[in-house]
């Protein structure tokens, strides 16, 4: 029986006898093969579906470690800045650990599903007029001056927890893929995966992938090599103009002979709809930067035909239902409450 990441991977994690056995049974997420897209693209494409984690995103992996260590160190309050998923994970694990959680969010820039989670888990929520980068700056300053644990990805325990996804990919495939494609926002996750692949390879000889990270064009600070003061993208989860793990992400790409690239909002939305309608996988828009990047780089030849590719889908599609409804051409059809009318419509729709 799966007992969570701290139990499963304790030999790889900085835990002690005093570390609480905190868990919501995070991790152990499916690696789903996409046969139709694999055939279309001429590659072997799989998706690591992190949206099935307890709060619906990959953030649970790092948060269980960050909160457990904060508890071990005697803190009773945690704090974070968030575009949504971090706040949901922080609030959930704080509730589980009987701790207080304070989150700062950019006002009006957080997907509804994520805000609802933070509210239900009991977080203290502060909205500011600035963006995520402004929020993180404030949180870091407050945590330096107060006995409050910072649980954003600048917290090294977050990276430790998140690296476990790379272990799972290797276990599920039997080896590392040729390419690991991943969205890049605050850049902690690409950093964590690369750390995980290196550690697992050192112990088990599973090989190392090329790390290919994808920023949204309107928030592509690393690609442009400049801080973006007012980042804008449909992909709210990666709407970050000054990534906290910038240097480490660049290092991960360089060490692995990979690349940090950018994709447009149109490319993200195309990928978002494509994997849902062709493969039955529903991920939030920010997640789909990885798929958009794979499509782009297969077309350019940067990802060779025949490659074994894992694209990380970082969050569940239900995190951002408004985007799904807003962009869909498929709208409910209103008909009379009459079987004959409905049958006639169904015959036309089904072409029977």
From Swiss-Prot:
Q: Does the keyword Zinc apply?
A: no
Family annotation (PANTHER family): L-THREONINE DEHYDRATASE CATABOLIC TDCB (PTHR48078:SF6), THREONINE DEHYDRATASE, MITOCHONDRIAL-RELATED (PTHR48078)
This protein is called Threonine synthase
Which classification does the entry list for the species? Bacteria, Bacillati, Bacillota, Bacilli, Bacillales
Q: What class of enzyme is it?
A: lyase
Which Cys-Cys disulphide bridges does the record give?
Answer: none
Q: What's a single GO MF annotation on this record?
A: threonine synthase activity
Which reaction is recorded as catalysed by this protein? O-phospho-L-homoserine + H2O = L-threonine + phosphate
**What SUPFAM superfamilies does the record point to?**
Tryptophan synthase beta subunit-like PLP-dependent enzymes
Q: Give the source species.
A: Bacillus subtilis (strain 168)
